[in-house]
Amino acid sequence: MATTMLNRSVIVNKEVAKTPNFPRATKNNKGFASNAAVQKCRDMMVWQPFNNKMFETFSYLPPLTDEQISKQVDYILANSWTPCLEFAASDQAYAGNENCIRMGPVSSTYQDNRYWTMWKLPMFGCTDGSQVLSEIQACTKAFPDAYIRLVCFDANRQVQISGFLVHRPPSATDYRLPADRQV
């Protein structure tokens, strides 16, 4: 029986040895307990609330390159989703009192009350990513000072799967680089 208990303690000790090492409280030179997590709390930043608006998926990233957009388009088409382009003027892109359709007591941040204009029709049956990229270029050329986003729909589930910006107007002042998003 003692052997069994010994074996169990060895097993438990091996399991404890596999667990990651977390910062432990240690005594500093003044005799007070200190913890590395306290230092991390001091390094926390405050989110910059001004001119720091986001749009859907990938908004926290810098603007996507053409190559990155192409990879996203390939992923959309590989899943048999339908891509669609939408655009909106700078002053109409965000939810607000001026650009929302009110149908009763609805909050101004309710997303379904704000519509972007569709660029042509959804690209039903599209299998070539270059077609989508050429439509993005055509829309950007036609509306250079508008926000343009690519959304995709799943016909089976009948829902929007994803949406992300593919063009931000050069005059937009609402975007901050990731390093400038906190103070």
From Swiss-Prot:
Belongs to the RuBisCO small chain family. One of its GO terms (cellular component) is chloroplast. PANTHER family: RIBULOSE BISPHOSPHATE CARBOXYLASE SMALL CHAIN 1, CHLOROPLASTIC (PTHR31262), RIBULOSE BISPHOSPHATE CARBOXYLASE SMALL SUBUNIT, CHLOROPLASTIC 1 (PTHR31262:SF0). Signal peptide: none annotated. Pfam families: RuBisCO_small (PF00101). InterPro entries: RuBisCO_ssu (IPR024681), RuBisCO_ssu_dom (IPR000894), RuBisCO_ssu_sf (IPR036385). This is Ribulose bisphosphate carboxylase small subunit, chloroplastic 3. It is found in: Plastid, Chloroplast. Its main location: plastid. One of its GO terms (molecular function) is monooxygenase activity. The keyword Transcription regulation does not apply. Residues 1-43 form a transit peptide. The gene is RBCS3. RuBisCO catalyzes two reactions: the carboxylation of D-ribulose 1,5-bisphosphate, the primary event in carbon dioxide fixation, as well as the oxidative fragmentation of the pentose substrate. Both reactions occur simultaneously and in competition at the same active site. Although the small subunit is not catalytic it is essential for maximal activity.
